[in-house]
Amino acid sequence: KLEIIEVADEKTPDNASETVETNIKNKEAERLLKYIRDDAYLITLEIKGKQLTSEELAQKIDTLGVQGTSHIIFVIGGSLGLGEEVLKRSNYALSFSKMTFPHQLMRVILLEQIYRSYRINCGEPYHK
C-alpha cells in the first residue's frame, strides 16, 4: 500500500539567518516525525546520501522486506532540507543526485523509482 503525506513548508523570510533557517527546519521536522511510525524504516532523501542504481534500490527494498520490514517511509525535505531530528531518526540516507530539485519534482522521480523497484523485484521488464 502506498500512502503520500504532504507536510506544508514553513514560510521562509528572504535573507533568513542560519538560526532562522534551523528553527524552520526544526518546526518542519516536528511535524514530519508525527507521521513516522516507530517500527518504520526511514529513508531520507539527502544530497549527501548514497547514490544507488535502480537495481540497487530494488535490492534494498527487497532485502528490507525479507528482513520483515513492513513499513518503509521515504522523506523528501522542504526547500531548506531536513531538520536534525529527522536526520537522526533516518535509517538510510539516499541521494538521487548532487543537484537540488524542487521537492514536487523529486516526488515524481521517487514514485517512479519505487514503481520501477517493484517491477524489477517481480522480474518484470519495466526497468529496461
Can you name each region flagged by the protein language model?
Residues 13-14, 82-85:
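Switch/connector loops and helix/strand junctions flanking conserved nucleotide-binding motifs
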Residues 49, 80-82:
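Conserved nucleotide-binding/hydrolysis micro-motifs of P-loop NTPases
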Residues 1-3, 92:
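Conserved beta-strand segments of alpha/beta enzyme cores
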Residues 77:
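Rossmann-fold NAD(P)-binding glycine/threonine-rich loop
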